[in-house]
Amino acid sequence: MHSREIRQSFLDFFAAKSHTIVRSAPVIPADDPTLLFTNAGMNQFKDVFLAKGTRPYTRAADTQKCIRASGKHNDLEDVGRDTYHHTFFEMLGNWSFGDYYKEEAISWAWELLTEVWKLPADRLYATVYHDDDESARIWAEKTSIEPSHILRFGDKDNFWEMGETGPCGPCSEIHIDLTPDGSGKELVNAGDHRAIELWNLVFIQYDRQPDGRLEPLPQRHVDTGMGFERVCAVMQSKASNYDTDVFLPLFQRLSELTGVTYGASMDGRQDIAMRVIADHARTLTFALSDGAMPSNEGRGYVLRRILRRALRYSRDLGCSGPILHQLVGTLADSMGDVFGELRDRRDAVERIIRAEEESFITTLDRGMEIFGELAAATARAGGRMLKGEDAFKLYDTYGFPFDLTRLLATEAGLDVDGEGFEHCMQEQKSRARSDRREKQQTGDGAGSWQWFSDSHATTFLGYDRLAMPSTIIGAAHASGHLLLVLAETPFYAESGGQTGDRGWLESAAYRMQVTDTRKDGDSFVHVVSRAFDKVRDTEIDPMDIVIEEATPVDASVERILRQETERNHTATHLLHAALRRILGSHVQQKGSFVTSERLRFDFSHFSKMTPEEIQAVEAEVNEHIRCAAHVSKHADLPYDEAIAKGALAFFGDKYAERVRMVEVPGISAELCGGTHVDNIGQIGIFKIISESSAAAGIRRIEALTGRAAEMLLWKEYHELQDVRQQLKLKADEAVAEKLAELQEEKKELEKELAGLKSASVIDALVRDATSAEEIGGCRIVTKVLEGVDADTLRSAAMALREKLPVSAGLLCSIADGKVSLAAFSSDVAVKEKGIDAGKLIRLAAAAVKGGGGGRAELATAGGKNPDGVAEACRIFAEDVRRIAGAV
């Protein structure tokens, strides 16, 4: 039975039992911050089990894509070393939400296994929880299983719990005996691959209380899971999951790419490599197809670790270049009919993986060299343990995940100091936290705060007001600045990438200029850098101002600066939406910086944007701006409601239970606490001024809006007009064509000039050579020329050997700190004297710390030591004298 048929027969079986066949949830959980990856079939129904959600059906079945590569469910380091661990797998499952219970679940499982799939009943065992008499009775009375094959186990094996508290219940597992003689009873639940679990039937009937008590649930549920690859191996009578047709297309493609056949290696090393690569290619392809991106944190780093681990194993197959991306199409072809996203995202996933491979290959080579040196040094010192700081260096400098270093160490017969590595990691994190704290401080050397209120919190009212009265509740001085905290403020404090507002605070005695507003916990700190004494009508040092308790002030934000900032902030939302539509849904915001002057937006993407893509994004944003749509700001929404309305939220971002959503209907919806325009038409113009790399896998766009964009366009227009005037272009003549024409003329003139220069150099050399030293009838020419390029030098050498019938020489040139050498030997000198320019130039080049070679008649070399040129000439001349004088 083909794997495709096995999967479909499972779904058909439960569809006939009135189950709704649901789609697999993405392997990237959309609304569960506790998970990096979907790791079980029940994940998408977790809210039902927790009584926080419902479904329009009470019976369901599916095949769920799962990844187990992090946390307690982590099979990563076992993959490849055996034949049954995977980081990606499918989980077949059926569920009852307060509908049927144990009897139906057990009876149907037995029916599918023995009557539909025809598995031998005498090889099947059912395990039950030690005091679950109900399940044991159902197995005995409602199925044909042998009574002696009903086995009881305790909490460890047969009691399922979602967490320390919450839904839980007994489970019943179905195992199959794969021993040759059917003697596997004692191997059940013993971790032996000869008696493996096929199917786990979980009966959720209790609610675990904080004190450990089990309270009956008002509704009982069924949650079952069966490993698809494992059941395929059993159904197809294969020795392992990797021998099934699930993996066959991948192994065939790997064989085409590497010339290595799975199962043919003598020591098993290449088989391990093929298993690792096949498994990891599946994980990467499915994860990226569901919107994940490799990165340096969270799930992105797990994927990067997996990719780099696979690349390391590809070396065991003789691969030195990218290979993983070439398996994406194989998966799309073999599994795309079931998981359509593999076909839909094929091209994008291939590009992402290839870019990651190419990025790591160079550092992999260098890192492998460094590891080899460290391992050799450890062995020479009689040690068996690689230092933690060395492992951290490989991680920090060459991108080697710790598990990759540990793998290499194991292969070299070494251990790695994991505690030392972790210590280095924590030290780096501490330094980073310290740096962040320093950046968040309102000023160096800030004195102690003087507080006039028990509460240090500021209420922000600046969404609707730019000016208002308030009261100072805190004050401090730091590095020439006065720092003030107000009870209420219209000033936006820097956060979410948006810079703090600027403006004025005015008390009865002082007028104070606020040049920045920053957050410090719940306090909004207004940074005063200039102040004026209203009584004396003079400017004073902010450090000299003494704030009295409960000082009232009028706070006013610079309106124009705020409006320009709002234009740029709303533009980042439009830009994000356009990037996701044009480049793909893998695009996620990775950072932003919004000021009144410009905006900067960092986003996940695997390659440099083409000019066409940049133009398309810019055009789409401007098209939206021209639509002049209203911007809706939904304050204090429940998080779930905001997500239901389509707001973007990404794993790793922290959100409160109640959020603020900024929406441009039909275009963009994001969770955002920043300030925005009321209508996107107010943005005016959007102009991208640069696109660059911010980090591996992260691109950066800088752009202008409003007046700044308008001024840039006017500046560029006037510069273009100046160029047209200088080029004396007619109205219908294009600047680019004229410049190309001028550049071509310039090249021709440079070529002509180089020819004249070369001829001049050659003429001078020939004149000088007539008086050169002569030994044994052979002229010896050595000459150092300043600023002559290598081509001219070579041409001069060729001319001299033609002009001087019996001669040998070395010409040298120094340009930009580099040395070029050209040696020649005339035909007579080669044939009758045995003077070989190719051999002699190699000896001379050593003096300039270089190398080279060529024919006996003509040879070239280069070097990086200009101070050695005289010595090179001396060596060459001495060698020619020796050879010519001996003939």
UniProtKB/Swiss-Prot annotation:
Composition bias, Basic and acidic residues: 425-441
Reaction(s) this enzyme catalyzes, per UniProt: tRNA(Ala) + L-alanine + ATP = L-alanyl-tRNA(Ala) + AMP + diphosphate
Function per UniProt: Catalyzes the attachment of alanine to tRNA(Ala) in a two-step reaction: alanine is first activated by ATP to form Ala-AMP and then transferred to the acceptor end of tRNA(Ala). Also edits incorrectly charged Ser-tRNA(Ala) and Gly-tRNA(Ala) via its editing domain.
Essential cofactor(s): Zn(2+)
Known EC number: 6.1.1.7
Localisation: Cytoplasm
Gene: alaS
Enzyme class: ligase
Protein name (record): Alanine--tRNA ligase
